[in-house]
Structures are given as structure tokens and as C-alpha cells.
Amino acid sequence: MKIILLSGTNRPNSNTRKVTAELEGIYREIGNPAEVLDLADLPQEIFHPSSYAKKPESFARFSDAILASDGVHLVTPEYNGSIPGILKYFIDMLPFPESFEKRPIAFTGLAAGMWGALRPVEQLQLIFGYRLAHIFPARVFMPAVNNVLDEQGILNDPELRKRLRDQAQGFVEFVQKLKK
């Protein structure tokens, strides 16, 4: 089964990418390795206005990965009470409707503040509901993310790691059931 882990920001050395790496390890542990798509790797030419009409070939690896996936696990930070602009732009650049229609999607949110990206995850649920995705109901919110990652970016909170593992395992089962 092909799960895409989408790191929802292009900020260098982001906590989002660190949490995505933790999830990548968790998916490997549960026997379902996931492929990471990092928005920091988006090709610069996707930002040219002509990309709305014709996507550059360098973007194909991103759209192809989403289209070939059985499910997408999206990790998002909270920027100014919302999702990162780059994440919304990425969603807008993907083929419509086939990128997310009937595709399972899970959400993990993280923030420096106390709400753990509750608002951006709820905003994404609206967007993906509109896109007719199958939304996995078990979300994980990571408040005060700077307090649960060590200097190397490793998660040091066993309870939070268990919640991420439970989410990943549940998402794999959710995707399997929807594939039947």
C-alpha cells in the first residue's frame, strides 16, 4: 500500500519536516513504509504564473506521487492561525478532481502555541471535504511542538509518539478497508 507523507511547508529545517520524519519511521515500524513529499523540494518553475495553464514537467513527480497513492497523511504547521500558503498553492496545482476525490487523507497538526494547529487541520478538513476525499477521523494535534522535539529533531514524548503510532496504524487500516 502506498502512503504519501506530505510535509506541508517549504520552510527550511522546519518542525513539520522533523515530525514528518518521525512519522516516516513509525510507518516503517508498522510494516508500511511511506513516501515523503516535502514542499521544500517544489521546483521553482511551479511558481510562474503560466503554471496555472500548463504545469512544468518538474512538477510531475509531485502530482504523480499523489495520483498513485492509496492515501495521503498530511502534516501541517499553523502559520498565522491558518495553513501555510505554500500548502494551499500545492493543493491548487494538483489535478482536479482526481488528486483527492475518494482518496483517504489523515491529518497531523503542530504548532508552537497551545492549540496544536487545530485551526489549520479544521480548515484542511473543509478543503478536502470539498475535494471529496475520505477524511480519517483520528487527528493528532501537537501543541508546544518545540517542547517535544529534542535538539536533533527527535520526538521525546512517549505518549505523543504512541498517539502518532496509533494514528498511522489506524490510517493504514482505514485505507485497507476503503480499498475493498
Map each language-model feature to its residues.
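Short helix-loop-beta connector
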Residues: E101
